[in-house]
Amino acid sequence: RKIIEIKSVNSEILGEKENLGYIRLKSFNENSDKQFLKVVQKFEKNLKLKGYIIDLRNNPGGLLTQAINITDFFLEEGEIVSTKGRKLLETRKFFARKGDEIKGKPIVVLINNGSASASEIFAGALKDHKRAIILGESSYGKGSVQSVIPLRNGGGMRLTISKYYLPSGKSISEV
């Protein structure tokens, strides 16, 4: 059977002067970072582009690695997110690598109460690093890292093992 790749990124150029890049990210799936970067690189060839609108409304989140990778496209350095749990293995920090793909251009991130998890990590980290203005409603508030423990009957139990924190130390539940 053929594997179908789900497109999680839509984009268009907006504005009277066609100088705003609009990117709608529906979820943080396996290849979202590659799709997202392709759009950003295409937009950056447009010399008139003055800034970006990144729409995360009703984005339920997805893979932590994708949230980190996509956030990293807009930061030169610094912490993106950390997890803190009772066990040492559940406590980790994730950092940006050098290289802002849009060279400091302004960003507006749109969120609502349907924006959760990875969306909150992305929006919160850009806000903490003063790279974006967040507009919309309060986000969903899913600040927990969960693990599924298999049960003998074939089912599973979801257990919160740690919590996500922004560079400022605030929980991502507060985005």
Annotate each PLM feature.
Residues N69, I161-Y164:
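Unusually extended, aromatic-enriched hydrophobic runs near protein termini
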Residues R1-R152:
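Cleft-lining beta-strand/loop regions that shape enzyme active-site pockets
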Residues P167-V175:
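Conserved functional hotspot residues or short segments at active or partner-binding sites
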Residues A116, Y164-L166:
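Short Gly/Pro-enriched loop/turn and capping motifs at secondary-structure junctions
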